[in-house]
Amino acid sequence: MNEKLRILFSFLCFFYVLLVSPSQSNGQDISLSCGASEPAVDQDKKKWEPDTKFLKTPNTVHAPATYQDPSLLSTVPYMTSRIFTAPATYEIPVKGDKRHMLRLHFYPSTYTGLNILDSYFSVAANDLTLLSNFSAAITCQALTQAYLVREYSLAPSEKDVLSIIFTPSDKHPKAFAFINGIEVIPMPELFDTASLVGFSDQTSDTKTANLQTMFRLNVGGQDIPGSQDSGGLTRTWYNDAPYIFSAGLGVTLQASNNFRIDYQKMPVSTAPADVYKTARSQGPNGDINMKSNLTWMFQVDTNFTYIMRLHFCEFQLAKINQKVFNIFINNRTAQGDTNPADILGWTGGKGIPTYKDYAIYVDANTGGGGEEISLQMTPSTFGQPEYYDSQLNGLEIFKIDTMKNLAGPNPKPSPMQANEDVKKDFQGDKRITAFVIGSAGGVAAVLFCALCFTMYQRKRKFSGSDSHTSSWLPIYGNSHTSATKSTISGKSNNGSHLSNLAAGLCRRFSLSEIKHGTHNFDESNVIGVGGFGKVYKGVIDGGTKVAIKKSNPNSEQGLNEFETEIELLSRLRHKHLVSLIGYCDEGGEMCLIYDYMSLGTLREHLYNTKRPQLTWKRRLEIAIGAARGLHYLHTGAKYTIIHRDVKTTNILLDENWVAKVSDFGLSKTGPNMNGGHVTTVVKGSFGYLDPEYFRRQQLTEKSDVYSFGVVLFEVLCARPALNPSLSKEQVSLGDWAMNCKRKGTLEDIIDPNLKGKINPECLKKFADTAEKCLSDSGLDRPTMGDVLWNLEFALQLQETADGSRHRTPSNGGGSVDLGGGGGGVTVNISAGESDLGDDLSSEENSGIFSQIVNPKGR
């Protein structure tokens, strides 16, 4: 009995030592909620402890945030902060011979007595500079995020203590530093050497390097929250859609749910299995693939070397030399010529993942995109492979430290941010809170340890899996991204009628600014009239051209639509959505301020116009751009967003003919792609209105698809959606076009300027797509992803017929996906079979796949 008591006493003393001695907690994950007074749990069930016992600097300030941004899904650790007006140090015990992951969490909100725009500071980890003269407020504005995570991978050192030093800038008289959360996680050594791109015989040593995570993407798949990461590293993997460049989006591939990933060549902690179960490829048509590529673009800081880690796993093919492709990074060959990429050649079998590391130096003196890293993949003909295609499953980009420095400059503020008058006097917080931890001795401490241990074990038994999405925002973005959304102010003033939610999302203009920019709403500046009111051309901030939509007091669209547009559009940033700069709600006036679209609306270029006629190829590119914007609304945001007023006057064109969807006053958030609907009062524009929605008052994203089908016929036929002057059967363009399509007389009603200029196969694909959009039942209509795929295919057919070698780049770019991650055409791989969905007929499927399997068929 005495022996059992001795063992129990030793066991409890061991846990007592772990509790009261920070120096013995090395090797464990540490998550600090800075400024908190007690432990807390975030929405991913991660435990955060107060930071006091690791803080070695007295007289610091802890301050709660006074405003909670709506996008802040978890209050922990962001609603508390630690403020420093002088240099301060955290000392965290670590194992010096191990690599550690360090995450710093910043929420540049309003803290009592402080102006967040005064916050400029540096952060160092031991002798490594992480941030220098850093402004979290400016950075979050540029990235249009409410909060920010900076993640680093720190190389092993000889020190058993990680010192994290915060130093307010001496360049700003009122400067202070702040931090909301700190994570330190021991990690396995996942880095070795990387091939230096462009120099076949040189490598870059990453085993001893300190790294900053710039991008971490699940290519072709959905976001993977930290709670579902492998190896306990709690990394978040984001969908790659926002970084795809050019018109070729490819298709996404997905393995079956029971497909097994075999980590025989690398540790499980390299990446979770879900990364290797999805991929993006160029698509099923090898002939088209040979004339195109998959391209991703990333903005980075210059004068650093970057490691691009590409993750691969083949889950469809089984033989070497079936799919071989080239890889180019910044137009330099990483894999190609006589040494192309062959996933099965690297791994030796299906379901075996691998990765390749490539190093590239980004020089500020290169010019012409020197702040970007591009990744391109094209099929290779080397060895006459069976398929002409390329594939990528995952991607990570890391910045390597230069002379113990990882810091880049702050983003360059846009003109709107630079002139925004939100400065306040820095008053400082005189309250200095000290959190003292005392240690109890003897039996009380042992019993306390035993109680904590028992509760911990019981909680472990009953804790289930967590299905919540991680609240952490992306860590990507460089120091040169610019945007206009403000995440600093929480409320509007001066008699604003807006809700706090809408008021805190973007810049608020004074009425005097708006009147000055429009010459007191001079009628000569009117460039359009809509349901909300007149649209004026204006100038702000000394020269920036904008479009200002001014409400009409007699309009049916009032405050609700005004708030809806602010709340929805200010959260969204996409190449094919018009950008909201700000609003004015003063003196009884309601105005919305947008980027100026110099080429006006799509309708202005189709009929009743003196403008030059659009070519068919340009019309296709505009339709593709608009489809991308709608597709992003349906699939790219947290919730499905249904536009509800898709028409040619709500598709705007910038100076480069890039199409942008506009006017979100009637938009609704939908049922998040679960096949449900939203019951709502019917709103929209006659001629474009979904008849099923009109009958049942049940709104789905397929209502937008119907409206877009009318837009497609409007693009083809160059006539209004409704024309009461025509005979009864011709009044509605949708009905008339469908009738002609069924009779085989569609060519009789297309725009006379296009006759003889459209490739017949392209016309058939385009018309079939528009016809499916106008199906009476929403269930029979394609998704916007399917529509986008078909329009891309139609463009390829037209370009092939025209003998075009390259796509017109003016409408390139985009941030949407054709597959499961971002929606659209997903090629679901199961038992070696591919399903392209209903958007292609069985005859078309057969033709395309026969071309792939037999290269001679190309």
Curated annotation (Swiss-Prot):
Q: Where is this region: Disordered?
A: 800-858
Annotated EC: 2.7.11.1
User: What does the record say about tissue specificity?
Assistant: Expressed in pollen, but not in pistils or seedlings.
Q: Which residues bind ATP?
A: I527, G528, V529, G530, G531, F532, G533, K534, V535, K549
Keywords, comma-separated and alphabetical? ATP-binding, Cell membrane, Fertilization, Glycoprotein, Kinase, Membrane, Nucleotide-binding, Serine/threonine-protein kinase, Signal, Transferase, Transmembrane, Transmembrane helix
Instruction: List localization entries.
Output: Cell membrane
Report one GO cellular component. apical plasma membrane
Identify the enzyme class.
transferase
| Biased composition regions of type Polar residues, renumbered to the chain | 843-858
Q: Name one GO molecular function term.
A: ATP binding
Alphabetical list of InterPro entries matching this protein: ANXUR1/2-like (IPR045272), Kinase-like_dom_sf (IPR011009), Malectin-like_Carb-bd_dom (IPR024788), Prot_kinase_dom (IPR000719), Protein_kinase_ATP_BS (IPR017441), Ser-Thr/Tyr_kinase_cat_dom (IPR001245), Ser/Thr_kinase_AS (IPR008271)
What this chain does, per the entry, is described as: Receptor-like protein kinase that controls pollen tube behavior by directing rupture at proper timing to release the sperm cell.
This chain belongs to which protein, by name? Receptor-like protein kinase ANXUR2
